[in-house]
């Protein structure tokens, strides 16, 4: 079998892989990139971008529900087939445009997931490929669940392609993926049950705000079952049945659809990493600050699959840039964890940046906690919103803001203001001196820094 050689071979065509590949080819290196799925990566084809297109329709319905009998006569109906057609106008062009862009740059494409043969070679499309450097940017995949019948469970890919809104659905797992789709389907008329092994939903987010969000979803018909361990899924004639254990008892719940939203894991199982001496664990490919494998100097990993990442698109792009730069110029750029906000796109939205309350109190001797329910404030009342709350964390010694957690209809935007404040080491007084538009959610942020918890 003839061996083809490249300077750089990239595995994965999402933002991280593309960014690294482009940096290398623009420096004159020969580059190839492979992907077993459509080119463009998760976010733009089957993740955050199409999700936001769909969820905005749930937002419109929810906004109308909140104002029903206050001027809105009737909550609008959503034509789901038309919505899906609109979504496809965003996702369908991505693979074609991505491939054209890469080809125009001189990058060769492979449409299969490769397997490492040894430290210097891999096999893809029946061909043996050697490279001076390999870049692994394969992202995340849904976590496999290991109980009877789990193989019939559908994932977020299926939710994004639903031909119609099911009458009933069960989600196994209440992380951000599960909560976002739970909100979307329940708002559009689906009877939703959330089954969670933990004590609450959204474990990484602030408990005070998560409780309020959970209460809103419950008021809108979502049933939460916590401390529940799934044990079996069965296909029935008209529906599916999930069996779970809770408080020592075996219980069941039935629905037309049952989804696996129990988290995502690095997509590395099928790469045969052990053949190439590439070390990895549950966090992904183990890398140093240069995004270089700790066990193989000619391998770099970036994006969700690296051990230094979070499942956030801006971070993937940054890591791809650093990996590409270091391949071209030698290890000169180090990855330093930037301040990255995160958002759960429910209604209300839950957003977070900086330290949690627990993290702040473990890092600083004294922490001021500004915490409150803002549901009686003007901006919430004019929307007839069911919840609006916040928690802001301040280092008492320096008076600098070190963490912010928001629950509101505009949290995905207003959290960026706190991101800017923390990045610029702003104190509470600095922040209060700023002038924002009024009346706006941005202006509310200053009022959050008045009364300590």
Where are the language model's segments positioned?
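Flexible, glycine-rich terminal cap/loop adjacent to redox cofactors
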Residues: 9-16, 20-37, 49, 53-60, ...
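Glycine-rich flavin
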Residues: 2-6, 22-165, 193, 198-202, ...
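A conserved FAD-binding loop/helix module that cradles the flavin
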Residues: 302-359, 438-453
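Glycine-rich dinucleotide-binding loop and its adjacent helix/turn
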Residues: 48, 138-191, 195, 223-224, ...
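Short hydrophobic core segments
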Residues: 9-11, 114, 129-139, 172, ...
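Beta1/beta-strand and adjacent pyrophosphate-binding region of the FAD-binding site
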Residues: 2-14, 165-172
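FAD-site-proximal beta/loop scaffold in flavoenzymes
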Residues: 150-166, 252-329
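A structured beta-alpha segment of the ubiquitous adenosine-cofactor-binding alpha/beta core
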Residues: 125-127, 230-231, 244-252, 264
């Amino acid at each position: 079998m003839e061996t083809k050689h490249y300077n750089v071979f990239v595995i994965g065509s999402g933002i991280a892989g593309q960014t690294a590949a482009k940096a290398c080819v623009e420096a004159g290196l020969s580059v190839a990139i492979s992907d077993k799925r459509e080119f463009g990566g998760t976010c733009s084809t089957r993740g955050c971008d199409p999700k936001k297109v769909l969820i905005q329709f749930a937002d419109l319905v929810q906004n109308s529900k909140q104002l029903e009998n206050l001027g809105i006569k009737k909550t609008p109906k959503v034509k789901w087939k038309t919505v899906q057609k609109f979504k496809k106008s965003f996702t369908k062009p991505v693979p074609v445009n991505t491939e054209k862009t890469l080809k125009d740059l001189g990058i060769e494409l492979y449409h299969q997931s490769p397997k490492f043969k040894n430290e210097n070679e891999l096999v893809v499309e029946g061909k043996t490929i050697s490279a001076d450097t390999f870049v692994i940017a394969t992202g995340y995949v849904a976590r496999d669940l290991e109980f009877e019948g789990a193989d019939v469970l559908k994932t977020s890919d299926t939710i994004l392609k639903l031909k119609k809104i099911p009458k009933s659905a069960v989600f196994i797992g209440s992380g951000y993926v599960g909560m976002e789709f739970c909100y979307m389907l329940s708002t559009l008329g689906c009877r939703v049950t959330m089954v969670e092994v933990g004590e609450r939903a959204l474990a990484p987010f602030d408990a005070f705000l998560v409780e309020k969000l959970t209460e809103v979803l419950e008021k809108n018909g979502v049933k939460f079952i916590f401390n529940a361990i799934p044990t079996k899924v069965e296909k029935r004639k008209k529906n599916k049945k999930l069996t779970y254990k809770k408080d020592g008892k075996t219980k069941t719940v039935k629905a037309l659809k049952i989804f696996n939203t129990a988290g995502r894991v690095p997509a590395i199982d099928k790469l045969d990493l052990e053949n190439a001496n590439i070390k990895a664990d549950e966090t992904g490919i183990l890398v140093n600050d240069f995004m270089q494998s700790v066990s193989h100097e000619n391998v770099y990993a970036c994006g969700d699959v690296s051990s230094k990442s979070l499942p956030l698109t801006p971070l993937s792009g940054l890591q791809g840039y650093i990996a590409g730069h270091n391949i071209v110029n030698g290890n000169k750029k180090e990855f330093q964890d930037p301040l990255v906000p995160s958002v759960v796109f429910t209604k209300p939205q839950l957003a977070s940046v900086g330290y949690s309350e627990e993290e702040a109190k473990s890092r600083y001797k004294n922490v001021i906690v500004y915490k409150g329910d803002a549901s009686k404030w003007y901006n919430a009342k004019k929307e007839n919103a069911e919840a609006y709350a916040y928690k802001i964390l301040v280092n008492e010694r320096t008076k600098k803001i070190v963490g912010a957690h928001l629950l509101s209809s505009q949290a995905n935007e207003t959290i960026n203001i706190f991101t800017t404040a923390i990045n610029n080491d702003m104190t509470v007084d600095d922040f209060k001196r700023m002038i924002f538009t009024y009346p706006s959610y941005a202006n509310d942020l200053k009022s959050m820094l008045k009364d300590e918890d």
